[in-house]
Amino acid sequence: MTALSLQQQLAESIYTALGTAFEAGQLGQLTQLPPRQSVVVEKPKVPEHGDYATPVAMSLAKPCRLAPLAIAEAIASYLASDEIGVEVAKPGFINLRLGHRFVAVELQNILELKGDYGRTVPQQPERILLEFVSANPTGPLHLGHGRWAALGSSLERILQFAGYTVDSEFYINDAGNQMQLLGLSLKQRYLQVLGEAVELPDGGYKGSYLKELAEQLVADKGDSLGGEPVEWFSAYAEGRLLEQQKITLQQFRTEFDRWYSERSLHCAGAIEAALADLEARGMLYRAARSRQEQSGEITGRSKKVQAPAAFEEEDGGGEALFFKAADFGDEMDRVVKRADGNTTYLAADIAYHWDKYQRGYGRLINIWGADHHGYVPRMKAVAQALGHPADSLEILIGQMVRLFKTNPETGQKEEMRMSKRRGELVSVDDLIEEVGVDAGRWFLLSQSLNTTVNFDLDLAQSEKFDNPVFYVQYNHARCCSILRKAPERGMPILERFEFLKPDGGLWLETPQERTLALRLLAAPDEYRFAAVDRTPQRLTQYAYDLASDVSQFYEHCPILPPLAENLEPALRYARLGLVVATRQVLATTLTLLGIEPRESM
């Protein structure tokens, strides 16, 4: 386990030097030290400016009433050591260069910690419930579900690696009109297979997967099910389709700690319990219209949004039960129970999140599609109304996935909306069949969540270096190949490698060696930022950059005989140790992304 990441170590050293300068009276009119988190350490865009830098002196110029350069020089005078080289640059940057011993010790840490290198302890440990995918059990999972699966499962691994306690959950949307419609659609398909001239219901499910289910029913049961109620067909379809979703997700390396049925909320009385909790807190009221409608506050746009909920729930002029969502920033209050006594979808969502908090989770993270964006304010309001901070509920909104493939006739990239095999929307199963799990996950993870993924099928299928996942896996396999060949050529893999020369210099002197070493040392920070910022895509970029460094190192720095037989054995072994460390960090990074670190290609 890495106690502190590299940037955290540097920030601590800078803060200590800052405190020493303050105690020595060298920081002008500064009356108290700033908080530790105010010390920012970043990588300069220009390598000549050092390995890392901090602009902290510039942020202190106003309270110190000193020039940033003078502040930087005061801090730097207490910061320089054998392990860190320090220089001050205008207008007040403190540039840091890692010393030979510092680099050698960190590389040895990688070799000793192996797969635990970069595993950290958060400053504020939390128990997190991560909910994602949560599809209706009414059909195969589409590409959007695949994106949430890749993102959620990677984020779970990354958060756990960063020291958080994380459970994952799939919310099964198995209560509502769609389940009745699913059962009716399957029953009609069943009757059609038996030769009856019946039509699918309006708005029914028309996918070929239901026809296949119906054909299987006829094969297993013959014509004996015609008298069964729609509910029987609903339950059968749900069971089969949910099981297929589980198989698909498992193949896509996505597992859940719990599958939570929406229907169970109704059966266990959770909805009434949650509403009773809100009512006891004064968060509900009964009225024919919301407070905003009564006062005329609702604008034309807002009224249009609210009307289907508000008026529909009145049922002939009775009083509905409203949640005071507007008290917490939502644009209006929301109906949770209609005048006829039936609860709304929002009531079930309130109960589900109430139950999450009841189970002791301090932070809830939901991954939703862009079509749920408007639902965020009311759920944030729910969290606050239940007595929790607004930021205890994080809702990550993701954009759609578009699939492109070259048309062999025109040579142009064209968007694929339908699966050629099934004549339906492309599913996660189709994606796995086309490009495999590794490429599928990589390309779905490689973009920011709020960016549409333009998935290039041709590129994902390519076994050339222009395919980023192939390139990264190839360079991991290249490291494995070197490590397999080394003992055969008289260089056994050691438990400990010596990276320092007797005079204190570093054996790894070339630009390619230093670049690769520093990239490895950045891994704990990359993992930490990916966890804190909820950005798994950061690790795809890191893995690609690391693979590029491996390629440059391999090209310019021979390791094994006969190419390296004229080099000093100590240099060859230092390079071999660097390969061992590189393979480990690449493997860890790919594993966190749910991608196989392949040992051969």
From Swiss-Prot:
Intracellular or extracellular location(s): Cytoplasm
Pfam families, alphabetized: Arg_tRNA_synt_N, DALR_1, tRNA-synt_1d
Keywords: Aminoacyl-tRNA synthetase, ATP-binding, Cytoplasm, Ligase, Nucleotide-binding, Protein biosynthesis
GO cellular component, one term: cytoplasm
Biological processes annotated in GO: arginyl-tRNA aminoacylation
CDD domains cross-referenced by the UniProt entry: ArgRS_core
GO function term, MF aspect, one: arginine-tRNA ligase activity
Chain ranges for the short sequence motif 'HIGH' region as given in the UniProt record: 135-145
Top class in the EC scheme: ligase
SUPFAM superfamilies in alphabetical order: Anticodon-binding domain of a subclass of class I aminoacyl-tRNA synthetases, Arginyl-tRNA synthetase (ArgRS), N-terminal 'additional' domain, Nucleotidylyl transferase
Keyword Nucleotidyltransferase: no
Cited InterPro entries: aa-tRNA-synth_I_CS (IPR001412), Arg-tRNA-ligase (IPR001278), Arg-tRNA-synth_N (IPR005148), Arg-tRNA-synth_N_sf (IPR036695), ArgRS_core (IPR035684), DALR_anticod-bd (IPR008909), Rossmann-like_a/b/a_fold (IPR014729), tRNAsynth_Ia_anticodon-bd (IPR009080)
Catalytic activity: tRNA(Arg) + L-arginine + ATP = L-arginyl-tRNA(Arg) + AMP + diphosphate
Keyword Electron transport appears in the UniProt entry: no
EC number: 6.1.1.19
Subunit composition and interactions: Monomer.
Family statement: Belongs to the class-I aminoacyl-tRNA synthetase family.
Protein name in the entry: Arginine--tRNA ligase
Gene of this entry: argS
